Regions:
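Amphipathic alpha-helical dimerization/oligomerization modules
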Residues: 128-130, 134-181
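Surface-exposed, charged secondary-structure patches
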Residues: 102-136
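Short, small-residue-biased leader/transition segments that mark boundaries at the very start
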Residues: 1-4
Length: 181
């Protein structure tokens, strides 16, 4: 019986370990088995998503001071003091007041993100569209930085922090006048 109780304990342990590897998600009332993954297995996807999310919050701007504060608050959870320094520099230069004064709307479009998993470094390539009353300006934007692992939170769902963030290129590529009737 000692042998059968050892076998029972071993079998139970295997079943519990197996059950812990299974995750179910409810679709309505139907449970669906999903594959559990580790951060290492999804790092490339999560890193790119994190970088794109930060750029969306930092560079999508509307002529609304509450909206700007909201998006900057969100962006600051995703970046270290290098992002805060850029924000403060722009604020001191009156950049955000100018947006409100001219009713400019800024949108960002990601072209690609190169991510080196080994070095945890990224380069972001995108275009920014700046729509003003009389014109639309398109700018080319290239930024770079590194990623550092941090605990996941509601404000930082990927558990990554952008560090040493800098702008490598931010230049005008096209200016169009609007036809105002």
């Amino acid at each position: 019986t000692r042998r059968s109780s050892d076998l029972s304990i071993w079998t139970a342990r295997v079943m519990v370990t197996d059950a812990q590897q299974k995750v179910y998600v409810l679709d309505g009332n139907v449970p669906i088995l999903v594959q559990r993954t580790t951060m290492e297995e999804t790092l490339d996807v999560e890193a790119r998503s994190h970088v794109e999310m930060f750029h969306h919050f930092f560079f999508t701007l509307a002529p609304d001071d509450k909206y700007i504060r909201y998006t900057m608050d969100k962006a600051m959870y995703l970046v270290d003091e290098t992002g805060l320094a850029q924000y403060n520099t722009l604020k001191e230069k009156g950049f955000y007041n100018n947006i409100m004064g001219t009713s400019a709307v800024f949108s960002i479009f990601c072209d690609s993100i190169n991510f080196n998993e080994e070095k945890m470094e990224f380069t972001y390539y995108g275009r920014q569209r700046i729509e003003r009353r009389t014109s639309i300006l398109t700018r080319e934007l290239v930024t770079a930085g590194k990623l550092k692992r941090v605990p996941r939170t509601d404000n930082n769902p990927h558990g990554l922090l952008i560090v040493d963030w800098r702008t490598l290129l931010n230049k005008d590529i096209e200016q169009k006048n609007k036809n105002n009737f």
